[in-house]
Amino acid sequence: QADIFAESSHGMSVLSCIGMNRPDIMTGTAPEASFWLLRSEDEYSEHLVEQDYWSAAVEFADSVGVDVINTSLGYYSFDDKSKNYKYRDLDGRHALMSRQASHIADKGMILVCSAGNSGAGSWKKITPPGDADNVLTVGAIDKRAVLATFSSVGNTADHRVKPDVVAVGVGSDVIRTDG
């Protein structure tokens, strides 16, 4: 059986930016917060059903009283290429997870979504659920405030500005599984 903690360090790196509480080493932005760690991603394939997994994780988070959700994933390309999203689909309503994200935001939860890592590729655009209404979509900049080449960009198909904010995502100190 695979070790989910060793398969990918991205979640741990993001968590360390938020929750690390070792003043002698690193202090995150919310060091006193408590966390539920939920994983919905199948790292080895891309299928529409992963949006169902994500929606179930978000519903679980709601059921246990989570106030803020950070999600560092998004989808636009699938193993079955006929399911790939088009730019016109980035309207906050087409993708299941975008509708779910809006629903969660309407309930009063804060949902923070990555803009995506497609800025240097042919897609370039943000990915669902980052196109959803009332979610905070975050792009990446370097320490000189220059947009990271990998950071996906907006706008949405219905002309909303995304990402909403940017944060340092290049050259940041983070905790990783490989030390």
Regions found by a protein language model. Name each.
Residues 61-91, 114:
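Short acidic, glycine-rich surface-loop motifs adjacent to enzyme active sites
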